[in-house]
Amino acid sequence: KQRVEFLEDLLFTHRGLSGPAVLQISSYWQEGTPLAINLAPTVDLPAALAQAKARSRKLIANELATLVPSRLADTWAQREADWQRPINEATDKALARLAEQLARWELTPTGTEGYKKAEVTLGGIDTRALSQQTMECKTQPGLYFIGEVVDVTGWLGGYNFQWAWASAHACAQALPA
């Protein structure tokens, strides 16, 4: 089982999860497979919550809103009665549970928006079937494949565009004048 991690933005929309993190993981996700999402990947949640408990009397949701978006903090704090109180009144066990759940939110997506809305595709002509220099099919001379029809997948950030341009250039250089 392959473990894949991304440190990218995550968007909550009216249709579900989206954003760069979802687009990245969609290349690897298999239907029915759960995902574990760290909702505060750059924060040491146990330490931050312990520090807040020692110095603050704010509601847990309000302290949490200094670490994650406020609407997420409000929604998350509503999940358990132990989290609906001032942070200095919370038990260490309740805060540890909160930190663990935020750092490892597990869910199983019910599906994708489908091919019509896809921004990431996988598959295509196996690169081993093509000349690396010309993109010509090894078994069918005169037949060339470039860009997204070839099984090359890059991370977000223009890599697929770069691959399309580079493979087109290699192919064009090889074509007879």
Residue ranges of model-derived segments:
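An anion/pyrophosphate-binding glycine-rich loop and adjacent beta-alpha core
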Residues: 1-93
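Gly/Ser/Thr-rich beta-alpha loop segments that engage phosphate groups in nucleotides
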Residues: 18-21, 125-126, 149, 156-160
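N-terminal low-complexity, intrinsically disordered patches enriched in charged
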Residues: 25-28, 132-133, 167, 177
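Tryptophan-centered motif/residue detector
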Residues: 29, 105, 115, 163-165
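Short, surface-exposed linear patches
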Residues: 33-35, 56-61, 124-125, 132-133, ...
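Short, intrinsically disordered/low-complexity patches at protein termini
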Residues: 44-45, 109, 168-170
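A glycine-rich dinucleotide-binding beta-alpha-beta segment and adjacent secondary-structure elements
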Residues: 74-153
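A conserved FAD-binding loop/helix module that cradles the flavin
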Residues: 152-177
